[in-house]
Amino acid sequence: MNYRKVFIVVFLFSLFCLGFCFAGFDNYETYAFEQLNEKEQEVYQKISDAVLNCEPIVVDVLVGADANMKVLSAFMDDNPGFFWVESRLRYSLFVDEDGNVRNSIRLYYTHQEDLSFDVERFVNLVSKFHQYIKDDENDWIKLYHIYDYLAKSIKYDNNYMDQSMWSVFFEGIGVCAGFSRSFQYLARQEGIPCLMVHGYERDSSGNIGTVGHVWVMAKINDTWYQFDPTWGLADANGNVDFSFFCRSDAKMGMTHVIRNNYPLPECPSDAFSYAQMRKRYMKVYDESIVVPIIQNAFSRNELTFTLEFENVAELEKARQSLLVEKKVFSLFKQAGFSVSNVLYSTNRQNYSLKISVSKFERL
């Protein structure tokens, strides 16, 4: 392998990845780094140097595998574009030639044999995605495009081991880490601050799971919001779930629990949630509002759409009226459509009602 060529390409790619570094007062590109103590930051820099050169061994690190894993995780949180480094390491002690006991970590890499070629392919592939985003679009629209693109283009495979962006962009397969790193990377290439979030999912009863989960938060107009691109995956008919797009800590906390190694910014608002932006949120259930919601959804080719409510009581009112009393069919007619079959699901955790139709006729 031509290591000189690899180093040059990787170095240029690192500049591409970090193009917005230090481009704002909060330095979001190095957010995780800034949460570390001085010794951890030293190891972070050693890991960075090693990754740029694909060097497997880093010496004189922190004591213990967990302490070093915290730093490696922070490095990967700041640098989603380094798809060739894996999120695992091996810690060990060794005796140097002077008889001193020292420690080290071993890093693991993928795609080493053709890394220069893979990096160039990756940069070219990602640049094509950005052709679909207009420079004059606001950040909410740009994040919508990213969320929608990942939800429709990538399949989730819980058995897939690659947690990087490589599998997402080149193989169309990923897990939550790959989805989130891809979202973060694409957002940052648009100049939008975006951070990784680590934690756990809640089940339908609100119990915290035992398997780790990863999602993101992004900044719009000086306010941070949470996003879970994995939970937005499109169904068999291509309908994307935007319930976890641009959410507050309170709303996302109904289904997610943050367990980060370092503090994250607060996400205080749902003002830019998909439901509020598309006027599908109701403090009090009002069936007259459902008609324009149907018209708006169908105009966007969304045959599955979600109504969101202030609390579980209003959700139950909507479910009773629309589905138990079957008023949903008359509302579709008022909106100008005839449907014969309506599927639905309720989520009492986030007070939402999902309505889906497979076929319709215009009246």
Show the residue positions of the predicted features.
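Linear, non-domain "peripheral" regions
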Residues: 21-124, 298-299, 313-321, 326-363
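Extracytoplasmic/secreted envelope proteins and their assembly/folding machinery
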Residues: 44, 69-72, 119-126, 130, ...
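Secondary-structure boundary elements
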Residues: 109, 113-168
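A mature extracytoplasmic/lumenal domain signature
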Residues: 109-111, 200, 231, 309-311
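Conserved active-site-adjacent core of cysteine acyl-enzyme catalytic domains
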Residues: 113, 161, 170, 174, ...
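Low-complexity, Gly/Ser/Thr/Pro-rich intrinsically disordered linker/tail segments
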Residues: 242-363
